């Protein structure tokens, strides 16, 4: 039948650049097709025409009946099948060898340029790289050519054409011979005078070989389908996923924020020197306990204090419950101012028992602000506001004015910081 060693060497080279399923397919091709066809099948079909006999003496009748019974010999049919299904693999091998050769030429050009620029050939310089730095390396860690890009497309087309050839030859074998050989074949073809009976040698053994080669072809077809799923379908599915959701891979690796970020509608995080400023004060039914302010002096100074918000002209809608909120804020600022300046000018109102009682009530009311009822909008603002108990920026204006006449509002003559 011929020597299959040359085709075997070529396919062995292609096996080095195939996937795992491709290597299994080539192993099946080597062992169960080429070796079986060369070792056993040729011996079974060796006496095929000589042992094909018909019960007639008409010249030429036996030949035409054999031609009708076997349009093509099984051996030659299977040989053509092996050649056709191996051709796409050989084309893929040619593409691999072309890429390897182009890489070798590129290295030779780099060495030639290096030798031309540096006669000492590489002392103090590395060879130039003509390719793009973004191009992936041609070989992997094991020194094998990577199946990617144009080479991957060639490999996929290789599998597709192998599958088509397998299906075509299986269908052709069914229409030509069927899957079973009968020992008796009746022929009425010219020049036979009438219907003659012809007999096939070793029909059972030949039927076994036909079924075996058909099973090997079906196994190769299944391997091709698995490899198409492994390469083509997975790559196609990955490409469609990346097309409709390009940030899916980044979202899987992106860490989640432990806390939600503050929106633009919320206030910025600032440090203030007085209690949190709520737009809706507590209901008058909430009663504050008179708790003394620790370390507070007995007589607050008579100073007019202008805060930074008042100087910038910010108007906050404040709803008073019997003037309690405004009085608390004024008393708080007076106490802070008294801590920063020595108490040299005690006022008559502060030294009186009524003034001392008012101081205790005001300090207790200011400390009770944290226990007031808070709306959801104010709760969101409180989360984004850092409250620190320290002195706010103060402006001392008209120290001689009495606290009874001051109402905490900004005057044209006040100086704001």
Swiss-Prot record:
GO cellular component terms attached to this protein's record: connexin complex; gap junction; plasma membrane
Superkingdom of origin:
Eukaryota
The membrane topology term of the UniProt record is: Multi-pass membrane protein
Which molecular-function annotation in GO is an example for this chain? gap junction hemi-channel activity
Q: Where in the cell is it found?
A: Cell membrane; Cell junction, Gap junction
**Where does the record place intramembrane segments?**
2-15
Q: Give residue ranges on the Cytoplasmic side.
A: 16-19, 93-158, 229-417
The biased composition feature labelled Basic and acidic residues covers 110-128
List UniProt keywords, sorted A-Z.
Answer: Cell junction, Cell membrane, Disulfide bond, Gap junction, Membrane, Transmembrane, Transmembrane helix
TM segment ranges: 20-40, 72-92, 159-179, 208-228
- Similarity comment text for this entry: Belongs to the connexin family. Alpha-type (group II) subfamily.
Q: What is this protein called?
A: Gap junction alpha-3 protein
**Annotated source species:** Mus musculus
Q: What is the lineage of its organism?
A: Eukaryota, Metazoa, Chordata, Craniata, Vertebrata
